[in-house]
Amino acid sequence: MDDLKQTEIGRSSVSSLRYVYLRNPALRAWIRMLHVSQKVQPALAEMLRGLRLNPAQFGILDTLAAREGLTQQDLADALLVTKGNMAYHLCRMEERGLVNRRPEGRKNRLYLTGEGRRLLEEALPEHEALIDERFSGLSVEERAQLAGLLGKLEHSQP
């Protein structure tokens, strides 16, 4: 019987904690952001698979298109991944002729190749269409508001 009481007490306190947890708007927003991301990621991965890319490689191409000449560490920092993870992806992408490293001073700088740029140009319209479809439940104004709020949140992080 003591075990049963312990279980009931445990359930009760978990229930109370969950109630308090879900009353917190920041926690609810966090959970919802995670859920949306988890629903979009598989569709994005499937779309990219058709181009023989994965989401990490797409992020690398997209970032280098905007900021060519980054070091491997700068690129890893921009994409919030480890230098080792970045090295893995860059080796595969170099083998495919999508990126190349050029020595500049004591560091190697990363650049898109013509093939990398072509593949990104092919992927971008499909990526945009998929994201537009997944955000179709929001008006254009709501999308802009959400982007602004998330940008504000992103820039407030240490």
How would you name each of these model-derived features?
Residues 72:
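Helix-turn-helix DNA-binding elements, focusing on the entry/boundary residues of the two helices
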Residues 57-61:
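Short alpha-helical "packing" element that flanks the helix-turn-helix/winged-helix DNA-binding module
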Residues 1-51, 152:
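N-terminal leader segment of winged-helix/HTH proteins
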Residues 82-85:
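Helix-turn-helix DNA-binding motif, specifically the short coil turn and the N-cap/start of the second
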Residues 52, 68-69, 80, 139:
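Central "turn" residue of the DNA-binding helix-turn-helix
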Residues 63, 78:
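Residues within the alpha-helical elements of helix-turn-helix
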Residues 91-151:
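Charged, amphipathic alpha-helical coiled-coil/dimerization segments
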